[in-house]
Amino acid sequence: MVVQAVSESLKFDQSRFLNDIQILSAAINAPYSESTTKKVLSVFSDSFHDGVVLWRATDRVGDALNYRFYSRRPIDTVTIASSAGLLSPDVVSNLGRLVTSWSSLYDGLPEESCDFDAEKGLVKAWVYMRGMRPLGDILSAEGVPESLKQHEERFKALELEKVRHVAVDYQKATVNLYFRAQGPISLQQATSFNALAGAGPPSQTQFLEMQEFLNAVGYTFAVTIRVDSGDIERVGYYALKLPDRATKNWPVINAQLEKFAQFAPSYDREEMNAVAWSFGGTKRYVKFERSYCGELVPLIKGWGTTLSS
């Protein structure tokens, strides 16, 4: 694993972060708890200081402001969170064991990271599989329920066969699978992908934007599955690292995300902005992510991620 050097001025600073998150949450009207945030920063201090940190928000007013660290070294986030009282024993024994199971694949190579809600604290664990891995490996890992396994052939029929990340949402009891989808995207492909979540095809405007910004070689596509029922709640298409807005227009974002773009600071030498179009049933929304500190772009390039610029 190549570890990127990060200059001292660009590293995580807790006081600065607490000031930044308070301003940002107020700007986008997102709930915020300083005490919960301080607890999170204490429990995962090493990961925030040594890893990469980013922001995430949606275009829906009142939605959470999220932040995430990507660890640069293997850690056991489930044990750390459990020991600190951030996860209940029931969550650890069910959803937590999925995280641990996936992390143990490939002789323990996968790396865990976490998502946090500015008000609620820890909400999600990520597992980077350290490469593009066969879907069958992911779904045959110990403890993976039939509710997830049942979709294997359907995914393969859509040529969704390689997984780079998985994520487990502790709050919503869902699992995300992040695939490399074959590009360039077509309307037929998007229609078939959306149908997984019971959604109609993207609008013409949405599709043209997706076609413009999703990498033509291949792009990140995610499905969100309820662990109990196996229902696919939504799908998402990720345009990672948008071009500099001064040189090329971004996809259309609403006033809520314009506020986020205005107030979310980034201290990385090369800023990373990303949008994701999400579809589930009749619901559609847009997510926006921005690098905060720790040098996100070199990290995701090291993963072999296809980018928009």
Swiss-Prot record:
Top-rank EC class of the record's enzyme: transferase
Database matches in InterPro entries: Aro_prenylTrfase, Prenyltransferase_CloQ, PrenylTrfase-like_sf
UniProt xrefs under CDD domains: PT-CloQ_NphB
Keywords: Prenyltransferase, Transferase
Protein's UniProt keywords contain Transit peptide: no
Top-rank lineage group of the source organism: Eukaryota
Additional observations: The gene is not located within a recognizable secondary metabolic gene cluster.
Protein name in UniProt: Aromatic prenyltransferase
Organism: Botryotinia fuckeliana (strain B05.10) (Noble rot fungus)
